[in-house]
Amino acid sequence: MANEKQYPMTKEGKEKLEQELEYLKTVKRKEVVERIKIARGFGDLSENSEYDAAKDEQAFVESRIQMLETMIRNAVIIEEDKENPDVVSLGKSVTFIELPDGEEETYTIVGSAEADPFEGKISNDSPIAKSLIGHRVGDEVTVQTPGGEMLVKIVAVK
C-alpha cells in the first residue's frame, strides 16, 4: 500500500485519534459483542431488531477502527513554521474580519482528519482555508464560499 493517502494533522489531533482507537478496541468493541450475545438469547434472529441493531453497530465500530488505524499509520505531523510566524499555514490559528464591517472570526487550520468547525478547526481543504493559506497579517483576501464571495482582512496569525 505504497500510495496510501497521507493525513496531515497536529500532534494533539493524532493523540485524540489514538485515544478514540484505544477506546473502541478496549471498551466499545467488548460492549457490542456483549449486546450481540444478549440479543441472540431473544430467539429467532430473522425478526430480532436488537440483534440487527447490535450487528449494525459492530460493523460501524469495526469500520471506524480500520479508518482510525489507517489515518494514524499515515499521519503527517504538522510542524510549526517558525520562520514565517505571520503567514497563514496548516496548524496555525487565523483571525480575520469580514469587510467592510463584519464580525471577527478565528479558525485553526488543520488536516481533514481532525477538522471540527464546532471547535473552530477547519480543514485545509475548505474554501476559507484554501483562500487564506499563504497570506499574512494585514492582507485583504477574497474568499470563495458556497454562499458567494466575501472580502476579509487577516488581523492575527498564531
From Swiss-Prot:
The keyword Transmembrane helix does not apply. It comes from the Bacteria. The lineage of its organism: Bacteria, Bacillati, Bacillota, Bacilli, Bacillales. It comes from Geobacillus thermodenitrificans (strain NG80-2). This is Transcription elongation factor GreA. Necessary for efficient RNA polymerase transcription elongation past template-encoded arresting sites. The arresting sites in DNA have the property of trapping a certain fraction of elongating RNA polymerases that pass through, resulting in locked ternary complexes. Cleavage of the nascent transcript by cleavage factors such as GreA or GreB allows the resumption of elongation from the new 3'terminus. GreA releases sequences of 2 to 3 nucleotides. Residues 10-75 form a coiled coil. Belongs to the GreA/GreB family. InterPro entries: GreA/GreB_C_sf, TF_GreA/GreB_CS, Tscrpt_elong_fac_GreA, Tscrpt_elong_fac_GreA/B, Tscrpt_elong_fac_GreA/B_C, Tscrpt_elong_fac_GreA/B_fam, Tscrpt_elong_fac_GreA/B_N, Tscrpt_elong_fac_GreA/B_N_sf. It holds the Pfam family GreA_GreB.
